[in-house]
Amino acid sequence: MSIQQINEYKLSRRQVLAFGGAGFITAALFGLTPVEAEASPKEAKKKLAQLTRGAELKKGLVKITLPALTQDGSRTRIKVSVDSPMTEINYVKAVHVLAERNTVPEIASYSFGPLSGKAEFTTRIRVARSQTIIVAAEMSDGSFHYAKARCKVARGAGGCG
């Protein structure tokens, strides 16, 4: 509502504030309050199920190198490698990186092929708070292998720990 509209209705400043306050209270009573923009481990598992198309996840082959404690979550170094011969019949097709408690659980997806030589990468990721990082690798035979690593964040990506 603009100032001109308020003046047309002959409302005082006090009445406008009262109506606005009543609106906020009504919204709060009906559950229309802002929620924390954070994913849950349940949402990360749901996203992982989408990425794997419901396939069974097997432990092994995937190695995550991640600091146990990072001072700044906005640029956490992560190294991922997948043990694969990378031949025409046995290679890594894709690697997906997820963070259980980031606003958007899926951090990155990388594609590989037999000519990649190695299924390995190093990058920096944003970690909102202390949480578990999940890496899933899709193999050429359609199977999925995964690993998890815990990272404690002293100061998160948003400036909070």
Residue ranges of model-derived segments:
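N-terminal secretory signal peptides
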Residues: M1-S12, A22-I25
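Twin-arginine (Tat) signal peptide motif
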Residues: E8-L17, V35
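C-terminal segment of N-terminal export signals and the immediately downstream linker at the start
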Residues: F30-K63
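Short edge beta-strand/loop segments characteristic of extracellular beta-sandwich folds
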Residues: R77-P85
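An anionic, turn-rich surface loop/hairpin at beta-sheet edges
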Residues: T103-R126
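Extracellular Ig-like/FN3 beta-sandwich strand-entry sites
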Residues: A128-T132
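Short acidic/polar inter-strand loop motif in beta-rich domains
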Residues: S140-Y146
